[in-house]
Design a protein with these regions (language model features):
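Residue-level marker of regulatory loop/turn positions in helix-turn-helix DNA-binding domains and
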Residues: 69, 73
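A generic structural motif
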Residues: 63-65, 84-85
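Metalloprotease/metallohydrolase-associated module, dominated by Zn2+-dependent proteases
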Residues: 1-58, 65-67, 91-155
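Active-site recognition of the HExxH zinc-binding catalytic motif
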Residues: 74-90, 97
Length: 155
């Protein structure tokens, strides 16, 4: 099944992340397991982050709330891909941004909404007023069944 069709079929963060891992393994021959996803109320200028040395990915709930459809899935894919690359040990932000774009371009094609998401980010539809909010409480929420692991793995 083509990757775009798989993304369209994705039901949740775990399905999208499985696709992220497939792209990275196929393109870079890199792979890791045991990651956990948290949704948090981050400042609107932050899409997500991976605390180095952890198994955690933290996604900004505020940027993605109330969004649906393929555009939403494309942004989630691009953000999770970016943070997954960090979790694999790539720490240079510019290098990771370029690699995120290249992987999306190579795997989805130039006209894909996933490639567009790597260029615009989830901030494209925000207004100036959205950025004027006070800093929120982080309020982390663990996303259950995020990583689909084939075979056994002990956390």
């Amino acid at each position: 099944m083509p990757l775009m069709a798989e993304l369209e079929k994705a039901r949740d963060y775990g399905d999208i992340f499985s696709l992220v891992k497939k792209v990275v393994k196929r393109s870079l021959s890199l792979h890791r397991v045991g990651l956990m996803l948290y949704l948090g109320n981050l400042p609107l200028t932050v899409g997500a982050f991976h605390p180095l040395g952890t198994n955690d990915l933290v996604l900004n709930r505020r940027l993605l709330k109330s969004k649906t459809g393929l555009g939403h899935k494309s942004h989630v894919f691009a953000i999770l891909l970016h943070e997954y690359l960090h979790s694999l040990g790539l720490t240079d932000e510019r290098q990771v941004r370029r690699l995120t774009y290249k992987l999306c371009l190579d795997n989805f094609g130039r006209q894909s909404p996933v490639v567009e998401a790597t260029l615009t980010g989830p901030w494209v539809n925000l207004s100036e007023e959205d950025f004027d909010e006070l800093e929120p409480e982080l309020d982390l929420e663990l996303v259950r069944n995020f990583e689909h692991i084939e075979g056994g793995y002990i956390i």
